[in-house]
Amino acid sequence: VLTVHRFHRLLALASLLLIASITDVAAEEAVFLSEPKMLQEHGAGEGPVWHPQLGLLTSGEGNINRRDLSGKTSIYREGAGTNGLLFDRRGRLVVCDNVRRQITRIDPDGTATVLTKSYEGQRYNQPNDLTIDSKNRIYFTDPQYGKRSGMEIRDRDGREIEGVYRIDPDGSVVRIIAHEVDRPNGLIVTPDDKYLFVADNNNSLGGARKLWRFALDGDGMPDLASQTLIHDWKTTRGPDGMKLDQQGRLYVAAGLNKPHLPQETADPPTAGIYVFSAAGKLIDFVAIPRDETTNCGFGGEDGKTLFVTAGGSLWSIQTAVPGYQIR
């Protein structure tokens, strides 16, 4: 049966395929096994991360919120002021505290440790999202949205920096990207530590809305000359949070359903999850009927549930392949 929702998804996908000049998607393995299902209307703005005992945590309404294994919701950490969330290999929650402009680690007992709050004496902008590689190095983005008067981080020529940083296990911090990306947002390192994907989401008029890939060396440093454009959202809202599945496919939250003129249009296929093959080819799209799809994360008992945050709401989609989880 061709439902109205299914029709709109197919129409959006047809537009996407035309834009991307993709002609052989039918030959690709299935990506999604269900339509998006709304789980919550409010309280899930960003950073969905799964824990096998706790359930799902999200950033929303100034707190870290919890949706337990039975679906019951509660506040996990009040007044957290966070955006991106990620559990490390020791079960500690590492968060981008964009209100306090720092990266914080929260132990299971609730003890919080600030990992970094400045670089070379300059306070960060708004730490947004993070990823962890196989050597337990933490990479995070530091964009600036809204007013820019409070920005401290600048290069030696006085230019403002919205950069990407890496925290090593010994606590040292290095800036690995400065001006190569306009306004870095979501990011992820591949499981083999060979590549770093960075979402360039500059929502200013004429800003970049692009997905980039950088090759990484053994020390976790990007080869800036390797910078490769994976996809360009042009004038609509660009890429935000992203995750990988166990086949190396990349799921990227992007787009919007209502134009924010003159800065951003609402061109088809609009807001949802864009899926790229391991080779960087756009292979699928599923629409989310809420403005601004912000992030996604895999979870569930079998790892085949993709949780999606969009405009404060929370959605779930069943996938054919489990998501990659830090182990």
Regions found by a protein language model. Give the residues of each.
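Bacterial N-terminal signal peptides
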Residues: 11-21
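Bacterial N-terminal signal peptides that target proteins for export
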Residues: 2-12
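Short hydrophobic transmembrane-like helices used for membrane targeting/insertion
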Residues: 1-4, 19-25
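Compositionally biased, intrinsically disordered low-complexity regions
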Residues: 10, 25-26
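Sequence-structural signature of mature extracellular/luminal beta-sheet repeat domains
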Residues: 27-327
